Each structure stands twice: as structure tokens, then as C-alpha cells.
Amino acid sequence: MELPRQKRIYSSLETRFTDFDSLTQELKERELTGLVRLTFDACEGIIIFDKGRITDGYEIYGDEMPVKDRRGRNTRERSRIEPGKIDVYELPREILQIFIMTLRERPTQTLHTMYTDFRKLLNFYVDRKLYGTLEVKTSQGKGYVLLDAGKPVDVFFCNKCGSEALNELLNVVDQEDVEMDIYSREGGVR
């Protein structure tokens, strides 16, 4: 799964050489707001931190919906017995909250670029100051546009983020038919 990657703190730490409890303690002392991604052969685990506290966790198996992993308990246990990689990202709180909402929800609508213009859809969200996430499924993977009051607060696609990811996503959407899942909600993330 593609994740927001504002500021990478650690990359590709191996679980067999990393004491996850010590890493968690360090992130607590740093008062991390962001996420820890653990990648294993069978699944990915995402552990959410808010001001140094573990607040949530999810396990993702392939392209399936994320499965709730209360405070990352299963993921932390798996890190002790299975080889895997650990990545740690610091994120602005608003981006983290929008991303968490997307993990928790099912899409409210699915559209296809065969019938819908992606740029017009983005402009519609901006004009109406809507909140939500656009998940774009391409041949190169999934891309995400996180919107707060219509403003794209983050875009991530193909290991890129921000305007670079948006430009790459727009190029791909121009060249192929893609499916878009829309996660929209009333109000904001405050």
C-alpha cells in the first residue's frame, strides 16, 4: 500500500536486527506524530503514533481492506518472529488524520476515467471545499490524493509525494483508463 511520506526518519530497518520495543521507546521520547510501516512477506503492518503514543494499528494483506490491529499488537508480535523491514515517517497531524479516516472507511463512490475526467473531479472537490481521499488505481500501483477543504494536502504515488507525485499521477491518468475510489466525508479532520 502507498503511504504518505512527508519526512522519513528510518528506512529499511530489518526486524531481525532491530529491537522494536527500543525503537518504540525512542519514538515515544521523540513525540512522533506519524506512522511506522512494517513489511513482511504475507502482509504489511501500519502502526499510528500521535505525539509519541501508539494510537492505532492496521494489517493489510495484499489489496484487501485493512484489518484493525488494536494499537499494532499483532504487528509488533509478528516483528519479533518474522523477517521484515521497518520504515518510520513523521507526518503533519492533518495528513495523518485524513489517511487514518481512509483506512477506516469504504469508498463512497467508484468512478472510471472512461466516464469521468480526473482533472475535473479534482476541480470539483476544490470548488466545493470538500474533504476526503481519491484513491486512483493504475497499472503502476495506487495513488492517493488527500483533500482538506478541497485543498490537496498530500499526494503519494510510485514512491513519490507532493507535487511530484501529483504530476506523475496526472501523466499516468492521461495515458490509461483507471478506476478511482472516492472517500468523502462531511466536515474536516479537526
Task: Put a short name on every predicted segment.
Residues M1-R190:
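Acidic, Ser/Thr/Pro-enriched low-complexity segments and adjacent helix/loop capping patches
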